[in-house]
Amino acid sequence: MGKKKIVTKKEGEADAGPKARSSARSGKKHVSAGTLYVQSTYNNTKLLLTDKDGNALAWSSSGAIGFKGAKKGTPFAAAKVGELIGEKAQNIGIKEVDVVVRGVGSGRESGIRAFISKGIELTTIKDRTPIPHNGPKPRKPRTV
């Protein structure tokens, strides 16, 4: 076994959780309304915040904040992503958002709930999950 490194925290230092991301860019632009795109798959949850023209203001995903493997697809990870994007939206000055949801993952609802818990008003929710019109053959069901 090798040596163990012991890290001592000083006063005033706060634990930022898994991989705290700096949002240095997010303070520059001030927008009052925007659109939140939620892409939720079985393996990951991604949130993208744009202005009304579609220009990206902030984004994050479960993998980007430090979750690995199967934990990325959990509702808890999606809630953490929603909180992070909600804080970035507050810094930008967003007051109301439209939500567009894509995918069938378990983080759909919890990501949105965590986002609106930051005090941002939700105007509409649209479900734009892609549905094939008899495209390629789907995956076989998983056997457990």
Ranges and model annotations:
Residues 1-144:
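Ribosome-associated RNA-binding proteins
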